[in-house]
């Protein structure tokens, strides 16, 4: 009975969900990673990460997260109202990691974030949406944020195919 239950188990959406692979770069949605600890746990699953992060930090400190996974970070794309808190931790503990800041507060900024992440990525890298923050500054909830990420990845894939839609 347990075996059948495990086989039938489907994880909830937006929890380390593979969205697509484009030109050897994997895109993973962990929009549910709404705090630094959850983002840290998510990043430990991948060796080379382009991290899309930011939102409402709710008073969190990101120093431990950046210290722990700084060697995995190939790049960071920041968005959201408290993006500067993460940027400060990166400057203190991983100053050589390329960082792109998306200043728009509109949900469509995710398209820019995904494009910026792809520009930093190499084949074999993982673009990981693990924001470490709440979503309410730009999105209805973490599900909306994850859906916007998936849509932005689809937009990028279509653009790289020459405008074809899937």
Give the residues covered by each predicted segment.
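Short, flexible loop segments at boundaries between secondary-structure elements
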Residues: 150-166
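Nucleotide phosphate-binding/pyrophosphate-handling subdomain across enzymes
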Residues: 1-73
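Short beta-strands and strand-loop turn motifs
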Residues: 128-132
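Short, solvent-exposed loop/turn segments at secondary-structure boundaries
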Residues: 139-142
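C-terminal helical cap/extension that packs against the catalytic core
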Residues: 64-125, 164-166
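Short glycine-rich, flexible loops that bind phosphorylated cofactors or substrates
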Residues: 85, 133-137
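Generic secondary-structure signature for well-ordered alpha-helical cores
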Residues: 7-14, 48, 71, 91, ...
